[in-house]
């Protein structure tokens, strides 16, 4: 015990001698308060942060000498600024994700354009979003089908396009004859309105093919056989 007490006393005496050097008294209960950076110091630090967010030891030392700060204080300031930028970025990303989730899944599909109809060359495309009255007004003023529509005609299987019997191989399903006219069935979205029949403009095989037997398929080899 005596030996331990002597060593402790000598150590305390040596520390006391070092503490009073330079007319400075060491207070073990002294609390060091954080110093706020001035506007001039903050301006230099922010300008440096824009060009280099992670300054090395030499840069921190130069900044400390220039601003009257310790290199450790400069290092802490840059650490805090990087953490602040990271936090703001994460917050902005979370807000963006919440905004996208509130819009719902329909918002992504609404911007996409509808697929083109396979038979849009045979009949006009009718958007489903349009009012119901649009389906009942046909033919339109700019339509080539100016003929009237027969009443009481049966409604067979729905099909796209029009043509004459035997034209299925060319992509034109046949029309039905009613009196002296021939009519094709207009295609509407399922469940919207009843099927209606319209009279196409008059044409025959010779209008498109010299003979249905001469050219069995579009682009096929000619055949000398006549109808």
Curated annotation (Swiss-Prot):
It is found in: Nucleus. Disulfide bonds: none annotated. GO terms for biological process: cell differentiation; regulation of transcription by RNA polymerase II. It holds the Pfam family Homeodomain. GO terms for molecular function: RNA polymerase II cis-regulatory region sequence-specific DNA binding. Residues 30-89 bind DNA. GO terms for cellular component: nucleus. Signal peptide: none annotated. Residues 92-102 have a biased composition (Polar residues). Residues 88-115 are annotated as: Disordered. Keywords: DNA-binding, Homeobox, Nucleus. It comes from the Eukaryota. This is Homeobox protein HD-10. It comes from Encephalitozoon cuniculi (strain GB-M1) (Microsporidian parasite). The gene is HD-10.
